[in-house]
Amino acid sequence: VQEFLNWTVDTIREDRLISPWLEEKKYEWVPLVSKSVTNILEKGRSVLVITDSDRDWFLKYVLTHINSQKKNRPFLPFYNFKSFYKDLDEVKTEDEINFIKDMLNISFPNGYCFWYIGRSQDARAILPKFSKNSFLWIFDEEIQDAFNLKNNDEALDMKLLQMFRLYDKTLSASLFAEINVEH
């Protein structure tokens, strides 16, 4: 079983489709991914994926590829949050947030976590930002316990695809006990 930080660096270096920029962010990446993978594989939590509207394409990409039959692994519990609650753009009050959380607690007795990809100030970010165990890829704001990116980065779309590729490889390696993501 390889140590997670070293495995991450080796994977970035060996995969010609992942650029070196991600290696420079390894100390941000590793603890966030470790927490996310542990939530799924160790704690049995489901992942509710949310993006801002500019990243709807990425949401479709993630959900199409995460459980692809080509992966030769068990399907993992990743869901489009909009399939549970369509009016996320309209959530404004604490009561609405609590009603949604109550529904999710009933629906997911083992627990759930959010994976949010998008602008920090977007209405869709409210629920994930204030929920524990969220996996956050946040744009245009430096937030602790989030992977921070810039919305005006010309390479942003490519970076998202590379990050997903590394995350997906991490899920497989963890699932097949090639690495241990826990510290």
Please provide the spans of the model-predicted regions.
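Conserved N-terminal alpha-helical segment that immediately precedes and caps sugar-phosphate-binding
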Residues: 1-183
